[in-house]
A protein has these predicted regions:
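Membrane-embedded and juxtamembrane structural elements of multi-pass membrane proteins
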Residues: 2-71, 100-281
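Low-complexity, acidic polar-rich segments
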Residues: 73-108
Length: 281
């Protein structure tokens, strides 16, 4: 267990360093790089905090060593084995009362194992709370909601974005703002208040663009980073910046093919929805 925790600590240090560097460079990257590239950069950090990439680098073995180096290592190994045998004989011939039993290393090992199990338990609690709150959230949204089938504007936007998969559309009183949920069985929830057709079209473009980009998968991966590195404050900063970059990237993708007037209308629609959500909280 402690070996796994050591790997996690290394990943955590790498991720913290990369996050700190990106936050320091953020004023520059926001001006120089488009939104999708900023999003991709944060994705790289997330991957580096989950996958120990150095384990995939091939290590040199005895076949790749020079003959002198290989002979040297073999001789050193033989010397270590002989020394171990001599030490064993000395220990066996030493009276019991004069033997020194090394217990410090054993105690340290127990402490390290305890820390590793504490980390594992914290990760379990984090995931339990995260999944529990998520399922309660879904139940609240689904309770009392109504599914809209073959909704014309929704289907039109799906065709515009070349989305063929069936995505359900539901109206919910518990939805403070439009949202896409469900990685395997996607559903778009919209508030129950009446909206004009153009506003609905902009909302559907936003949520379906999230689906097309696979943003839900990325957010689940960011949640996994939070769970594994729950002790690292930079993991929470990373998660917040991932969410921000995700929304900005989605907005830029939506307005890319819109006229200037439509872009203004879209941004005003998003700002109005954000204000409505804040008031409901």
């Amino acid at each position: 267990m402690f070996e796994i925790f050591k790997t996690v600590l290394m990943l955590s240090c790498i991720g913290a360093g990369m996050t700190m560097l990106l936050l320091l460079l953020k004023p520059l990257t926001v001006r120089k790089f488009p939104a999708k590239w900023q999003y991709a950069i944060w994705f790289v950090v997330v991957v580096c905090m989950v996958i120990p990439l150095w384990k995939f680098i091939p290590q040199r073995d005895m076949q790749m060593m020079a003959p002198q180096e290989a002979v040297g290592q073999i001789a050193q190994s033989d010397n270590q084995e002989n020394a171990a045998e001599i030490e064993t004989v000395i220990i066996e011939q030493t009276p019991m009362e004069y033997r020194e039993i090394p217990i410090t290393a054993s105690r340290s090992l127990r402490i390290y194992d305890l820390v590793a199990y504490l980390w594992f338990g914290g990760m379990g609690v984090f995931l339990l709370l995260a999944f529990g709150s998520y399922f309660l959230f879904l139940m609240r949204k689904k309770h009392g909601s109504i599914e809209l089938t073959e909704y014309e504007i929704f289907e039109e936007v799906k065709k515009e974005l070349h989305i063929r998969r069936h995505i359900r559309l539901r109206v919910s009183k518990a939805a403070a703002s439009p949202m896409l949920v469900g990685t395997f069985f996607p559903v778009v929830y919209v508030p129950s208040n009446q909206l004009d057709k153009e506003t609905e079209r902009m909302i559907f473009r936003h949520e379906l663009t999230h689906y097309k980009h696979g943003d839900l998968v990325f957010k689940w991966l960011a949640l996994l980073v939070n769970a594994v590195h729950w002790f690292n404050p930079f993991a929470y900063l990373l998660s917040a910046n991932v969410s921000e970059a995700c929304e900005v990237s989605c907005d830029m993708a939506v307005i890319k093919n819109l006229s200037e007037q439509e872009q203004k209308f879209y941004m005003n629609t998003i700002l109005d929805l954000v204000e409505q959500e804040k008031r409901r909280k």
